Amino acid sequence: MALIPFDDRDGVIWMNGEMVDWRDARPHTLTHALHYGSQVFEGERAYGGTIFKSREHTQRLRSSCHYLDFDLPVSDEEMDSIKDMVLAANNIIDGYVRAFCWRGSEMMAISA
């Protein structure tokens, strides 16, 4: 059985404030996260079309962003809504969602 690579699948991903085609969701090669690992994520399970403890996951994601000194650019309510929209747009009833945030390419230096 051949596996479909993760970068060649059908669906949509929320990226930089909009839904984008799965195949087009690519960070720039000079993004800080690729060079220095400055990324946070939260793995979340969905059951019956609803993310289990979504708000708690969002709050933990926000806290993780804080530890790396960057902001989650949306409110908790907006983040929960975005995750629900991604589930619906991809017809996910029972599945896994990974919300993640990273620093962009606006800064490549190491700072203290």
Predicted regions and their residues:
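Conserved alpha/beta cores of soluble small-molecule-handling proteins
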Residues: M1-A112
